[in-house]
Amino acid sequence: MILLSYLLTYLLCALTCSARAIHNGRSLIPRAGSLEQVTDFGDNPSNVKMYIYVPTNLASNPGIIVAIHYCTGTAQAYYQGSPYAQLAETHGFIVIYPESPYEGTCWDVSSQATLTHNGGGNSNSIANMVTWTTKQYNADSSKVFVTGTSSGAMMTNVMAATYPDLFAAGIAYAGVPAGCFLSTADQPDAWNSTCAQGQSITTPEHWASIAEAMYPDYSGSRPKMQIYHGNVDTTLYPQNYEETCKQWAGVFGYNYDAPESTESNTPEANWSRTTWGPNLQGILAGGVGHNIQIHGDEDMKWFGFTN
């Protein structure tokens, strides 16, 4: 009887432990069709939260879009307020929604840590989310993209500068150049009024050197960039559109003063699209302030999901 009791106890424990292992194993794989948090995606030096949307119509070797929220925003708010999850169901890509760890939920685009490749800041944490997702879902590393609005657009430019090897393209909605919000006190999540008010003005070559210094040993290809901004933005002044386009024109070696083309009323009335080359476009929205509309269908074209 004693032996039988031990055997029954052992079997019960084995079944319970196995069930727990299966449950825990499943918990590591986010459910498709809903926004899910991933708590263990590797090194997370700045405590950024990771949320992910895996579509029910997941492509084999899917693409990835990193969608970065604005100040006061959250992953949930950007998931609900942007078109990327819905577009993921159509095109089969995965969406990563990082969430800022700071009060007010702006992003750290000001410290040396975040402005340095593998420097231990927010950019480092977000890059590790991309690496985890690529491995977990056997994603196509040539189809990884980044976009964001306001503070998220600032981080989009920072990600393109600090991790150019990870991204094929970026789209920044109402941001500033990478490095423009640098804090002289090396404070994360700092506000830079000089930059915000469009007073940080320099040459394309100087802006390019700032971006390139964030990953100084890198000599590979860089993500093509599309820059949106409203021409009556009073939060991040419209001069930041000019300076951001200068920065990427400098990076790509384009003559900022001689764009290839400028199209009026594109992608909508009173908006204009300027193209400097295959790797850089700027869209200036006439009569639009800081709350600029995301153009999901246009984003899909820039990212190569549609023609």
Swiss-Prot record:
GO molecular function, one term: acetylxylan esterase activity
Pathway(s) of this molecule: Glycan degradation; xylan degradation
GO biological process: cellulose catabolic process; xylan catabolic process
Reaction catalysis annotation: Deacetylation of xylans and xylo-oligosaccharides
Any single GO CC term annotated in Swiss-Prot or TrEMBL for this entry: extracellular region
UniProt cross-references to InterPro entries, sorted A to Z: AB_hydrolase_fold, Esterase_phb, Plant_Biomass_Hydrol_Est
Active site: 150 (charge relay system)
UniProt-annotated location(s): Secreted
Glycan attachment positions: 192, 270
Segment forming the signal sequence: 1-19
Superkingdom of origin: Eukaryota
Membrane recorded as keyword: no
Enzyme Commission no: 3.1.1.72
Broad class of the protein's primary localization: secreted
Described purpose of this protein according to its UniProt entry: Acetylxylan esterase involved in the hydrolysis of xylan, a major structural heterogeneous polysaccharide found in plant biomass representing the second most abundant polysaccharide in the biosphere, after cellulose. Degrades acetylated xylans by cleaving acetyl side groups from the hetero-xylan backbone.
Quaternary structure and partners: Monomer.
Family stated for the protein in its record: Belongs to the carbohydrate esterase 1 (CE1) family. AxeA subfamily.
Protein name: Probable acetylxylan esterase A
Protein's organism: Aspergillus flavus (strain ATCC 200026 / FGSC A1120 / IAM 13836 / NRRL 3357 / JCM 12722 / SRRC 167)
